[in-house]
Regions:
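Nuclease catalytic cores
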Residues: 22, 26-77, 118, 122, ...
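Extreme N-terminal basic, low-complexity initiation segments
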Residues: 1-3
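A residue-level signal for conserved active-site and pocket-lining positions in enzyme catalytic cores
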Residues: 36, 62-63, 171, 204, ...
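Metal-dependent nuclease catalytic regions and adjoining charged, substrate-binding loops involved
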Residues: 24-25, 112, 191-194, 209-306
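Mg2+/Mn2+-dependent nuclease catalytic core
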Residues: 141-250
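Short helix-capping/linker segments at secondary-structure and domain boundaries
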Residues: 47-50, 70-78, 210-216, 282-286
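A non-catalytic, helix-rich entry segment at domain boundaries
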Residues: 5, 65-153
Length: 306
């Protein structure tokens, strides 16, 4: 957990005022900008237990084992060096076996699907080995790095607002002139996700830059989608960070005005994936759904039968 969490909250309202700051993560900004603003807000203020989904369990397990895989690699540099030497000799099968020995086996209800993701990660890393000379070239300089930062955001009509940014970056690798951020995604890939992924990485690059960590400038960012056999590594662009900051300012303004829009017409399909429809202004019969969720007496909207 972030060291600054006690002084901030995702469920900030104007009544809280200066007692706490607005807290923002990559996920909250992404949900606000690319999915449903109201769902984001309800997920922070309603005491509703989110449903367990297989894809969330798979993602969590694969992330945990991938983190351990790189920890094991750092603890066994001789294995990494052996794999690098074999990569230069074209012994891909041996490279795979060496790296695979460092990766914890998948287990549990979704073991087969999780193992498919993990085996792809090893095959992808075999390709990376061919560009390495020593273990330090292969291993990340940061593995599941936890970041916090306090920044001031200029909000139209409200001036500068101090907020708390949170972030956990899957992996950070060294480049010639700085570092590259790399995310692991166990979901599906589609080209329409490219702007979204750039936005996520821009957020991480910004948080890393303004945090206390000194890993160097972010020169590249990328992502790996094992399920889709897809990965990218792109040059980091300032324009993406500028666009992300504008979305961040809009999110903060929504907090200040307590104004989180429901999905627009034509995007109602998103509601089928929501655990908070009973509290949503688009569907609820209550004028005070959040208060009802927290035990208050219901106030019905005009025209609704009690």
């Amino acid at each position: 957990m972030g060291v600054l969490n006690e002084g901030s909250t995702y469920s900030w309202t104007p009544i809280i005022g200066d007692d706490k700051m607005i807290r923002v993560s990559k996920s909250t900004l992404d949900s606000y900008s690319n999915w449903c603003q109201q769902q984001l807000w309800l997920s922070k203020v309603c005491p509703q237990e989110e449903q367990t989904h297989d894809y969330l369990t798979i993602g969590s397990n694969v992330h945990d084992r991938t983190e351990q895989y790189y920890i094991n690699g750092a603890d066994s540099p001789e294995v990494i060096q052996d794999a690098i030497d074999n990569a230069h000799l074209g012994n891909d099968k041996k490279c795979y076996e060496l790296l695979r020995s460092l990766f914890p086996d998948a287990e549990g209800e979704y073991a087969d699907r999780e193992q498919d993701n993990q085996d792809w990660m090893v095959r992808n890393d075999v390709r990376r080995l061919k560009h390495c000379v020593k273990p330090e070239d292969f291993l990340p300089v940061a593995n599941e790095i936890d970041l916090d930062a306090i920044v001031e955001v200029e909000v139209e009509g409200y001036g500068k607002q101090q907020i708390h940014l949170r972030g956990i970056i899957d992996r950070v690798f060294k480049t010639e002139d700085g570092v590259a951020l790399m995310e692991l995604k166990t979901g599906k890939w589609n080209t329409y996700k490219l702007p979204q992924m750039k936005g996520e990485m821009a957020y991480y690059a910004y948080v890393l830059d303004v945090s206390d960590n000194d890993l160097g400038p972010v020169t590249h960012w990328g992502w790996r989608f094992p399920k889709a056999d897809h990965w990218d590594i792109l040059e980091a662009k300032k324009v993406s960070i500028t666009a992300m900051k504008k979305r961040l300012a809009k999110l903060v303004k929504s907090y200040l005005e307590e104004d989180f829009a429901t999905v627009p017409k034509g995007q109602e399909f998103k509601c089928g994936f929501c655990d908070y429809m009973s509290f949503c202004p688009k569907y609820t019969p209550y004028a005070n759904p959040i208060e009802v969720a927290n035990g208050a007496e219901a106030i019905y909207l005009e025209g609704d039968v009690q």
